[in-house]
Amino acid sequence: MKTNPIHKEIKANLARSGMTLTEVVSKMNMNRAADNQTTIQNISNKIIRGTIKYSEILEIASILNMNIVWKDTRKEEIQNV
């Protein structure tokens, strides 16, 4: 099975932060209502399949003390011409 870019990026950022996905999911559940809890298996499957919600990615980034940056690539195209 081909690894999707989201999977690679989340794995790399977990490694950079020194946290495991288990620790991240535990922190996710601390901030969620009891009826909205998730599991390591659920999040892992979503990451692998590429079906994870953007809101969950933002939640993971926040736990890792990271920001997601949207960069205007049109400016790069103009500068590289």
Regions found by a protein language model. Name each.
Residues 27, 32, 77-81:
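Short secondary-structure boundary/hinge segments and terminal tails
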Residues 1-23, 27:
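A short, Lys/Arg-rich alpha-helix, primarily the initiator
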Residues 12, 37, 62, 69-81:
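Short, charged recognition helix plus adjacent turn
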Residues 29-51:
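Recognition helix of helix-turn-helix/homeodomain-like DNA-binding domains
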Residues 53-69:
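DNA major-groove recognition helix of helix-turn-helix/homeodomain DNA-binding modules
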Residues 5-8, 19, 38, 51-55:
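Residue-level signal for the short linker/turn that defines the boundary of a DNA-recognition helix
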